[in-house]
Amino acid sequence: MYGAVDRYNRANGRAVGRGTSDAGQQLQQTVDRCRFRAAQVLGASAKEQIVFTLNCTDSLNMILHGLLTPGDHVVTSVAEHNSVLRPLRHLEATRDVTLTLVDVDDAGFFDAAEVEKAIRPETQLIILQHASNVTGAIQPVEDVGEIADKHSVSFAVDAAQTAGHVPLNVEQLGADFVACSGHKGLMGPLGTGLLYVAPGQEKELTPTR
C-alpha cells in the first residue's frame, strides 16, 4: 500500500475521472481495479455497488443522513460506536427521527429476537455493528438480515472492525448497506472507507454532498 501511494504521489498526481491523458487513464484503471477487488473481498456481485468514502464514519453518515426522513423509526443497539449513536441522536433532535436501542448481554451480544420485537410500522432502518472493538463480540447480523427482509426494513451493517479480518459476504448478511473502514483490516491508507450499496438501494439514498 505504501509503495502504491508513493508511486502515485511521485509519478502521477492526477485527479481520478478528469482528463484523458495516458497518466489519467492509468489512474482510472487503477481505481476501477481497486473497486473490483473490494467488491470481491466483500462478496458484492458488481464493482458498481462499492462507493469509496472518506472513512467508515463517512459511510455511516451517508446512510443515516441520506436515508432517514421525519417520522422514521430506527432500531439499533446500546453497544454501537459513537459514529452511529451520535448522528442518530442528532437526527432525533433535528429531524424527528425516533430510536429504539436494543440491550446487550454481559458478553456484549444483542438478541436478534429483541431486534425483531423493536420493529414498528414506521421503522425505516435497522443499523447494527458486525463486531465490537470493545468486547470483540461478533454479532448475529445474518439473523437480523433475515428479519429485516421479512419486515421490508432497510438493514445497515457497521463492519469497521471486521472487513478484512473476518470472512464477510454482504449478500449472505442480507444487508442493504455495509460500511467499512479502509485503513483497518482492508489495509488501505488513512482517509479511506467503503460503502456497499445493494442493487436498487441507491434509489433510496439522497446524496449528502
Q: Each PLM stretch: what is its role?
A:
Residues 1-209:
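Pyridoxal 5′-phosphate
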